[in-house]
Amino acid sequence: NGWNENKNYILIGSAAWAGLVLLVGTLNYLVI
């Protein structure tokens, strides 16, 4: 059970980072 929760946190964290990177990249593309 603990391992499953860890996996969920890793997935959510990865998705959050991916979204953040995409957002920053899009903003940079629009600004420049």
Swiss-Prot record:
Name of the protein: Photosystem II reaction center protein Z
Any GO CC annotation of this UniProt entry: chloroplast thylakoid membrane
Tagged with keyword Lipoprotein: no
Membrane topology: Single-pass membrane protein
Keywords in alphabetical order: Chloroplast, Membrane, Photosynthesis, Photosystem II, Plastid, Reaction center, Thylakoid, Transmembrane, Transmembrane helix
Annotated organism of origin: Euglena anabaena (Euglenaria anabaena)
Biological process terms in GO annotation: photosynthesis; photosystem II stabilization
Family under the similarity heading: Belongs to the PsbZ family.
Entry's localization field: Plastid, Chloroplast thylakoid membrane
Primary gene name: psbZ
